[in-house]
Amino acid sequence: MESWPWMAVVVLLGLTVRWTVSLSSYSGAGKPPMFGDYEAQRHWQEITLNLPVKQWYFNSSDNNLLYWGLDYPPLTAYHSLLCAYVAKFINPDWVALHTSRGYESQAHKLFMRATVLAADLLIYVPAVLLYCYSLKEISPKRKIASALCILLYPGLILIDYGHFQYNSVSLGFALWGVLGVSWDWDLLGSLAFCLALNYKQMELYHSLPFFCFLLGKCFKKGLKGKGLALFIRIACTVLASFLLCWLPFLTEREHALQVVRRLFPVDRGLFEDKVANIWCSVNVFLKIKDTLPRHIQIAISFCFTLLSLLPACIKLTVRPSCKGFRFTLVSCALSFFLFSFQVHEKSILLVSLPVCLVLTEIPFMSTWFLLVSTFSMLPLLLKDELLLPSVVTVMAFVIACGTFFPMLENTSEEQLQLKSFAVSVRRHLPGFTFLPRIMQCLFLSSVITMVLLTILSVTLDPPQKLPDLFPVLICFVSCVNFVFFLVYFNIVIMWDSKNGRNRKKIE
């Protein structure tokens, strides 16, 4: 318990950084007619407050779906409604139907930022603290350090408090789910993850590891006895939670189908804007987004996604463990980001959360990944005029991680979790003893490339014939890094012989 005062200091530091970033610009500030995600969140408050539930997801004269139509699950809509009631109490003009479109003021900005902070404090921050405090076999100092580094992760701060979204809500629920199933509170863990999934459909990135881990637990208990009972209880919990969230939309079949259509808009294409995944990178050379029929794009992305995540999921099902679960969360989320259909640049945050959870186990690789994930969103951050907050938060994160987890000192085969893999390789190549040096060189090359591209993007104008040169280069470089990380995490998973024997609650 003596570490809790220091945990309080960590929280205050994290909140200070968050609120400082919130003083900066936001998505679409002063840019009519569509503005940006800030206006989207405000508009959803306007719609949910002034229209009946049955009209929230339907196009009408009062709800133009082409103007930031609601396209997130019901729990997001309920959250918007809750915020709308508070907004109406403070100033009804903020959420007045039609007349509030594009509303901007310092008071309203303060309110919107405060709603993000409140959600963070209620859901995400407590989950992070509990997770770090519950880590086993590490010192209290290391627990505090891990909490500090996670709370200072710049990607989430810049998107939620700069660009403006509520990612901490879905990620927080997902983290509560991780805690629940890791402690064998499987029903509570399942409920928490269902809340995450009903807040943002992109939490599907984490769904297969949850399913495989819980299914593996049921298999271990025996599907003819306790395992079957556990499976039924979990299934009932999932069905009940979805039923409660979707109840207002299940009165009519067409209503439910319309919500599903809004959640999965296949007409938007293979990817949006510049995103650091395989399809956007390949599209630079082969215009697959424009030449291939939409159903072929969906089929190809589905097949590649499934093939890339299948090995890790199979192993987790056969040999369920807390450690395997965390690493499979990383691998599967990264597979979805790289290969799935309709990916946004901000979806990398879904990979960053589980990477934060393995920070104490592989600090070198985790820190490296988290830096690349933030860099991959640089075009969006520059568009929102968030260069200064980006530089400052990244530097703060690097200093924190470098102080408590000296990165270049944590690159031995054991610390990289690659000992088993290296031993296997040395059976065929006895001279393969330079893996740590390779990783250090790759890290330095990656960091230098990111720094150079950042400087070039800020200081130089692109050629007139290539206006998107720097965003494309940033996405391509980030994608190459992510493919490398996908290979790395799968090697760790497949060569880890401890997964099947490890039964500790939180390692």
From Swiss-Prot:
In the UniProt record, which is one GO cellular component term? endoplasmic reticulum membrane
Organism encoding this protein: Mus musculus (Mouse)
Name it: Dolichyl pyrophosphate Man9GlcNAc2 alpha-1,3-glucosyltransferase
Segments in the Lumenal topological domain: 24-114, 165-172, 251-297, 354-361, 407-437, 490-507
Single GO MF descriptor = dolichyl pyrophosphate Man9GlcNAc2 alpha-1,3-glucosyltransferase activity
Localization (cell): Endoplasmic reticulum membrane
The UniProt similarity line reads: Belongs to the ALG6/ALG8 glucosyltransferase family.
Its function?
Dolichyl pyrophosphate Man9GlcNAc2 alpha-1,3-glucosyltransferase that operates in the biosynthetic pathway of dolichol-linked oligosaccharides, the glycan precursors employed in protein asparagine (N)-glycosylation. The assembly of dolichol-linked oligosaccharides begins on the cytosolic side of the endoplasmic reticulum membrane and finishes in its lumen. The sequential addition of sugars to dolichol pyrophosphate produces dolichol-linked oligosaccharides containing fourteen sugars, including two GlcNAcs, nine mannoses and three glucoses.
Its topology with respect to the membrane? Multi-pass membrane protein
